[in-house]
Amino acid sequence: MIELSGVTKSFGSKHVLRGIELQLDRGKSLVVIGGSGTGKSVLLKCILGLVRPDEGLITLEGQNVLTAEREAFLARFGMLFQGGALFDSLRVWENVAFRLMRGPLKRPKDEAREIAVEKLRRVGLGPETADLFPAELSGGMQKRVGLARAIAAEPEIIFFDEPTTGLDPIMAGVINALIREIVTEMGATAITITHDMTSVRAIADRVAMLHDGLIRWSGPVGEMDSTPDPYVQQFIHGRATGPIAAVR
């Protein structure tokens, strides 16, 4: 469904992506792991067409992402942002229904609210939450609202950017379980960026290790712990010594 071939991207003299080769089938969940500053966010932006690669090709079902009609293309995606990225001035339901009240996905206001309340229910939040403002919610509740917003428009592809950052282990486990359940129910294709190895094991079908602008290893999550790849082993066990410099 999504394929990257020979993708490179530099910013000045800094080579962020140096020939990415990656493929993800429809309905599968890929988790990209790697240290801070290794290009994971740039990779996502390239897939979305928000950053233009210097070289290489990225296709979605065979179509170049850079030549796709923008609104229709972006309507196929949902995203859970690292910091929640909720609009403080909008009520919870308005945040969830944000894409349903404008653009090609626009619905009547009452219908958009109804969908938002249903998506909130799906992530474990009652209808009484709908008219609150984000500041009235805990961090875990805000993360659930972000997840509800990501799925509100029934996207084919969902990006999760550090979905458990800032959450305690119990709430992180709840979010991981919700992500796995919802992605499976929807039959969506998912790409997740995370440093949290518990999340990796909970939500991944496949894992790709990104370091120094290259995919150093990719494979089924069940093979991650047994691979002899030194980059993967150092990263997943948090070792200070190995091919990845401890100070970057």
Predicted regions and their residues:
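Conserved ABC ATPase signature
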Residues: 133-137, 141
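Conserved catalytic motifs of ABC-family nucleotide-binding domains
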Residues: 154
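ABC ATPase NBD coupling module
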Residues: 64-78, 109, 224-227
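Helix-to-loop junction immediately C-terminal to a conserved catalytic motif
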Residues: 48
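Catalytic Walker B motif of ABC-type/P-loop ATPase nucleotide-binding domains
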Residues: 158-161
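Conserved ABC ATPase "signature" region
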Residues: 109-128
